[in-house]
């Protein structure tokens, strides 16, 4: 087993005792950091940054040099899998992702390959291995993937969307076709995350960014069912240590019981959920991650500290809480604000862990 100098993140995910509440931030390696912008400029474009193991490692480590974070998260993108399937991913300057060859027909679904993670996605595994080496046991490394539903929205829509008309048209008019697509993507995610774990990821997270746009039955059938399949297929122990799995559906507060029943170790919460209620509902089954509104980081230090203390009080005593934002950090927050956030969590959480 690799020795970890700080394992409180992994312990909290498994609801084991910790000395203080661990914290990391979604998108902690990103555009709010001037050093990230410099490294991205050096890479040339976003996907070149992802594909260069040394530069991906550098941006993964940047936030850890500034803030006392309890975990590192692999720098990559959720759209690596559809890109490896041959859909032709591009990021225009100042624009969101676009696919040159979106999924529009039955034959497109049938001909979709399942990528070999150590071939088409080897650059991701190289990044994981490089980051693990450079972390040198300081904190654990989180691997991740998008959820099948969320990946399928981009694959069918051809990029970002606010209306979700194409994917929902397929869902209601051709449900069998969408299930076939989701099944293929789920199989790909299992292979991808297991390869990350073998390469050195010590925990994994599935980002279901768009699950919250679905109705109740549709969420269970078209999103959660496939995350459940992934959870069942994952390596749950590696290098003599359990590998915790976190599921995060943005807008998923209505489905906490169903998410907990997948057998995941933790549920990520957005800021619309009350942490005390979530703990009362599912805290006996899973750990909880979250859930400060990222926009609080625009506020004065005292207001950030106040929000941290409120959320800590909502969770109350005991382990099983990983502090995080309710979604990714905004790109224009002051770089001093995350330090206030992280330090406040460590300072004010200690009494809850006696």
Curated annotation (Swiss-Prot):
One of its GO terms (cellular component) is cytosol. PROSITE patterns: UROD_1, UROD_2. Keywords: Cytoplasm, Decarboxylase, Lyase, Porphyrin biosynthesis. One of its GO terms (molecular function) is uroporphyrinogen decarboxylase activity. SUPFAM superfamilies: UROD/MetE-like (SSF51726). The record marks 77 as: Transition state stabilizer. The keyword Cytoplasm applies. Belongs to the uroporphyrinogen decarboxylase family. Catalyzes the decarboxylation of four acetate groups of uroporphyrinogen-III to yield coproporphyrinogen-III. This is Uroporphyrinogen decarboxylase.
